Amino acid sequence: MAEAAVASTVTLPVTGGWTKHVTCRYFMHGLCKEGDNCRYSHDLTSSKPAAMMCKFFQKGNCVFGERCRFEHCKPTKSEEVSNPQMLLLSSTPPPIDPECSESGPRLKTQDWANAAEFVPGQPYCGRAESVDVEISIPLIEELNGDATTDKEELRKQLCPYAAVGECRYGVNCAYLHGDVCDMCGLQVLHPTDSSQRSEHTKACIEAHEKDMEISFAIQRSKDMMCGVCMEVVFEKANPSERRFGILSNCSHCYCLKCIRKWRSAKQFESKIIKSCPECRITSNFVIPSEYWVEDKEDKQKLIQKYKDGMGRKPCRYFDEGRGICPFGANCFYKHAFPDGRLEEAQPQRRQTGSSSRNRNSRRTQLWDIIDERESTGSLDNDDEEMVTFELSEMLLMLLAAGNDEEVTDSEDEWDLFHEELDDFYEIYL
């Protein structure tokens, strides 16, 4: 009994301290929560832990950076080349003795009773099927062939970096560096693809023509002087005022601010302020433009572009078919239903009746429309002149709709319209 007690006292320290010879794997990564109370060893000098490489760093997308607890090191080239082959070879069964392999096909048709006898120390050949060692060699060659094919495909594609500037890889780039385009000076022309070369050349020529048009427009506009303020429009201190006001029926130059101020004057008659300050030719509206336009054909294109731009905006009075637009077919805005259908133009019907009560009621409708416009907010500067022209046409239409006489175009009617419109809406006529 005494000997057993002594033996037990001797063996206790051994059973309790063997863990101190094992390095704590949590401490190796800095994650041990036990600290000094840990049963395992925290001494790294006696242990050589295997380096755990960060697989995300090898793929180039480790978000922890320097704070990552795994090792950031790129695999060597020998590892990159050998790893696929090692995985491929390890997945194939080991080579078998030819004598054993010969019996493999026969085992498919023979009974298990005739299987080869198991001999300790030698590979068992009873259930093993014949494996052709030559199969693994074409697989490796196929792997290398796929890599070669990928490189060949990359060599057929233009380098995206060289196409927009400079490629830092130079001659070592895996992509193809195209020929330099004479128009844009970039390496974007494929050496062998003729269709790509022709398409890019065509696109370059179109872009060059647009740039030339802008250059000519700037050259034509840089010295133009406003006929009211006598300042060069392109040299105005406020950049927002460097815009031209193109009159629809006149070729005199004015800045947009001055011509709108001229057309908003109240001390002159409407025909005077609607006319050009120099030649007195009447223009229905003013078109804002960044560049000066004088040629008649270019001016028509500008007017059409201006109307097309307004035609893409939905009419607030039509309201996708829920409302009624007082301008009807003469409205420059878009009359479209929710499903995309456009409103069909309706023929105008002439109403009879010459009583002053009917005429006054139609005038009241006009001022109600102006009040509604004023309550919803002011228009954009680009829309003011066109809306003014629309309102003037509607006024004449309403004045003429109440009788069978000729259309009234007196100065009193027009001045009344002009004064009320300025008071309610502050639009430049």
Swiss-Prot record:
Which Gene3D superfamilies has this protein been placed in? Answer: 3.30.1370.210, Pneumovirus matrix protein 2 (M2), zinc-binding domain, Zinc/RING finger domain, C3HC4 (zinc finger)
Zinc fingers, C3H1-type, are found at 18-45, 48-75, 153-180, 309-338
Residues in RING-type zinc fingers: 226-280
Q: Could you tell me the EC number(s) of this protein?
A: 2.3.2.27
Bias regions of kind Low complexity — which residues? 348-358
Q: Where is this region: Disordered?
A: 343-362
Q: In which pathway does it act?
A: Protein modification; protein ubiquitination
Q: Where is this region: Makorin-type Cys-His?
A: 181-208
What are the protein's GO molecular function terms? Answer: ubiquitin protein ligase activity; zinc ion binding
Please name the GO terms of the biological process aspect recorded for this protein, alphabetically. protein polyubiquitination
Q: Which domain of life is it from?
A: Eukaryota
Question: Which intervals of the chain form a coiled coil?
Answer: none
The UniProt keywords, alphabetically, are:
Metal-binding, Repeat, Transferase, Ubl conjugation pathway, Zinc, Zinc-finger
Cross-referenced InterPro entries, in alphabetical order?
A: MKRN-like, MKRN1_C, Znf-CCCH_4, Znf_CCCH, Znf_CCCH_sf, Znf_RING, Znf_RING/FYVE/PHD, Znf_RING_CS
Tell me which SMART domains the record gives.
RING (SM00184), ZnF_C3H1 (SM00356)
* Catalysis performed (reactions): S-ubiquitinyl-[E2 ubiquitin-conjugating enzyme]-L-cysteine + [acceptor protein]-L-lysine = [E2 ubiquitin-conjugating enzyme]-L-cysteine + N(6)-ubiquitinyl-[acceptor protein]-L-lysine
Q: What does this protein do?
A: E3 ubiquitin ligase catalyzing the covalent attachment of ubiquitin moieties onto substrate proteins.
Q: What is this protein called?
A: Probable E3 ubiquitin-protein ligase makorin-1
Species of the source: Takifugu rubripes
Q: Which gene encodes it?
A: mkrn1
